[in-house]
Structures are given as C-alpha cells and as structure tokens.
C-alpha cells in the first residue's frame, strides 16, 4: 500500500510540475506578445499625437494668416478711402457715418450666415442690453475713423492700440478697480511712447494727408474715442458674464444696433444723399467701399475663429503684432515720414503692449485669470474686433 501511494504521489507531483511549466510558458509567450505589440501601440499613439498637433499648428497658421492678410488689406483700403482725391475737383469721400453703416451691414450679414451654418442656440441676452454698449461703440468708431481726416493713419493705429490707458483710467475712476503694479508700468511706458510720437515736431504737415486740418483736433477726438473704449469694456464684461452670449450672436445683435444708429447719424448729417451722388459721379469709389466692408467682415470671422480655438491671449498677441505691421505697411506704402524719435516711440508703445501680454501669460500659468488689457476691446468693428471670452 505504501508503495502504491508513493507512486501516486510521484505521478501527481510530476503532473503539477508539468502544469506549472505550461503556465510559465504561457505567461512568457503572453509577455513576449505584449512586448512586441507595445512599440506598435506607442508608435500609433505618437503618430496620432503628431498628426493632431500638426493639424492644430497648420490651423493656427491659417488663422494668423487670415487675420494678417485681411486686416492689413483693410488698413490700406481704409487709408486709401480717406486720402484718394477723385476727379478734377480733387474730392475726397468723407462720408464716415454712411461708410460705417455699410460696414455694419456687411458684418451683420456675415454674422447671420455663420450663425445659420453653426446652428447656434438662441441668445438669452435681452436685445435692449446691447443698446448702451452699441451707443458707446458707435461714438468710439465714428470718432476713430473721423480722426484719420486730421492725423496720419500710423498715429491713429498706434493710439488705438493703447487700450491699457483708457481701461485702467476708467477702471480706477468709475469702478474703483485695483491693478498689479506692473500694469501701471505698462501704462507709463505706453503713455510716454504716445506722447513722444505726437510731439509737434513729430506731427508736422508732411505726415498729414489733408493740409490745413488741425491735428490737435484729430488727437482730441481720438482721445475721446479711447475713453469710450475704456467705458465700454467693463459693460461688455458684465453682459458676457451675466448672459454668456456666443461671439457670433453678440456680433450679430451689436451690428443690428450699430446699423440702426449709424443710419440715423448718416441721415441726420445729410450724408446719404451726398454719398449716393458722390458714388454716381465717381463709380470707381465702389471698389474701395466694397473692399473696405468685405475685408472687415472676413477679418472679424478670423478673429472669432482664433479666439474660440486658441484663446483670447493668443488672439491678443496676433492682433497686437498685426497693428505693428499695419503701421509699417502704411508708412512705406503711403510714404509717411518718421524721424528717429517716432521710431523709438513706436518701439516703446509695442514694448509696453508685449509686456502687458507677458504679464497676462504669467498670471495664467499661476492660475490667475487676468486678460491682457492690451487686448482688443470686444466689439464687432474692423478696427477693434470682438473677442469671445468670458474672462475678457
């Protein structure tokens, strides 16, 4: 009996060893298979990562190119409209309210088409809420465009780039806001740059297309335009925080108001009949008007696209650098004469704007949501387009 048991035990031990060996072999085979498949999986993940980021980078380049192309063209056309003299009588198309009403119509149609394509939800913002913001916007835009008749286009673009000044000034005066110390440094640098650029020596008649016009008056109405931007920004912030409208919806509703207000202004100033007579007498101006309106509408869509896809900080960086190139294009294309002091002033202003963007990026990394005050004011115009960010 003991011998039989011993034989059975040996057999069972042998079977257990064989079973363990089989299990071990299976485990090794599985490990080998997994090890072979891991590089393939990793390669697939890497390829997917590269393709995704390559698409994003190409799309970003596409957005940057769109903003640069259409807003640089817009700047050229805008200045061309204000300096071209038609006919033997050397008449200038000076019907600002009529022109801006047409621009708002094109912007409104553009926003409406985009909202249809995107099938956006209904905007819960009361329509009348857009009225006050639109009124400030109309005043700001009208004065900004009117100022080009008295000062050079580079001066206008440089001044309108300086949003930190009115935003901080109005924030302190009306809303008792507090800002980081570096923001005040930004304002000092930009203010000094603007002051140097606008010295009497720097604003001689050779820089002004309409001789005899008072550049001091042009600077004054430009200053009022900037103050309107400073007042308008916080009200827009509040509207966006409270009702959360989409960028396209805000563009559409604001431009409906703008169209109505600019139309009233154009009729009140007697511009409608005069502008139509001018167009009939000099039909070549139609090409400039259409280019002005179309580049504005398309450029705005690129602004919205960039903000929605890549954020307001990236969009602010693009628009800030774009304004710098707009000044350069205007200087070289139209032959504006600048001295060394003015070039230094331009560098100071854009240096301050870049510092403002750097502060905003640094705060974002620290988890502090602080939009660049150098960013374009969020309203749908061609000069300072809307940004679709609640943090703005």
UniProtKB/Swiss-Prot annotation:
Transmembrane segments: 57-77, 97-117, 124-144, 155-175, 179-199, 215-235, 247-267, 285-305, 341-361
Protein location: Endoplasmic reticulum membrane
An MF annotation (GO) of this entry: UDP-glucose transmembrane transporter activity
Keyword Transmembrane: yes
UniProt KW rRNA-binding keyword: no
GO cellular component, one term: Golgi membrane
Gene Ontology biological-process annotations: UDP-galactose transmembrane transport
Stretches the record annotates as Disordered: 1-40
Coiled-coil zones: none
Disulfide bonds: none
Pfam family membership, one: UAA
Residue span of motif Di-lysine motif: 389-392
Composition skew (Low complexity), residue ranges: 25-35
Basic and acidic residues bias spans: 7-20
Domain notes: The di-lysine motif confers endoplasmic reticulum localization for type I membrane proteins.
Protein family membership: Belongs to the nucleotide-sugar transporter family. SLC35B subfamily.
UniProt xrefs under PANTHER family: SOLUTE CARRIER FAMILY 35 MEMBER B, SOLUTE CARRIER FAMILY 35 MEMBER B1
General function of this protein: Probable sugar transporter.
Protein name, per record: Solute carrier family 35 member B1
Organism, scientific name: Dictyostelium discoideum
Lineage of origin: Eukaryota, Amoebozoa, Evosea, Eumycetozoa, Dictyostelia
Gene assigned in the entry: slc35b1
